[in-house]
Amino acid sequence: MFMIKKKKNKNKFKKNINLGIAHIHTTFNNTILTITDLQGNTITWSSAGSLGFKGSRKSTPFAAQIASSTAAKAALEHGMLKVEVFIKGPGAGREASIRSLQASGLEITSIRDVTTVPHNGCRPPKRPRG
């Protein structure tokens, strides 16, 4: 028998970008963070689910903190220094992800809440009974 050698893709090249945008999407189940340049091209992304958190652990602030620090380290490798933050959603990881971005060395220039608010559209899901 013989082994098939896998070729490693080297399509991840280093970009020199000083200013970027961090899009943080927090839901009740997960936190997704995408860091883009000013044109909207994705530099790096991370989510709580992609880092191995499963089930209800994905929705914790700790999972959001780990996801945002992972994305911030990758953005720092691309030369990013400053970032604008657009945060969307009602999730638990809102503040934790912003704090983690700041602690990892990115300078936050502005924070915008772009959560969409319905003008009494769809009926919301039932409230959890606790």
Swiss-Prot record:
SUPFAM superfamilies: Translational machinery components (SSF53137). One of its GO terms (cellular component) is ribosome. One of its GO terms (molecular function) is structural constituent of ribosome. Keywords: Ribonucleoprotein, Ribosomal protein, RNA-binding, rRNA-binding. The keyword RNA-binding applies. GO terms for biological process: translation. The keyword Ribonucleoprotein applies. It comes from the Bacteria. Disulfide bonds: none annotated. Part of the 30S ribosomal subunit. Interacts with proteins S7 and S18. Binds to IF-3. HAMAP family: Ribosomal_uS11. Located on the platform of the 30S subunit, it bridges several disparate RNA helices of the 16S rRNA. Forms part of the Shine-Dalgarno cleft in the 70S ribosome. Belongs to the universal ribosomal protein uS11 family. This is Small ribosomal subunit protein uS11. It comes from Phytoplasma mali (strain AT). The gene is rpsK.
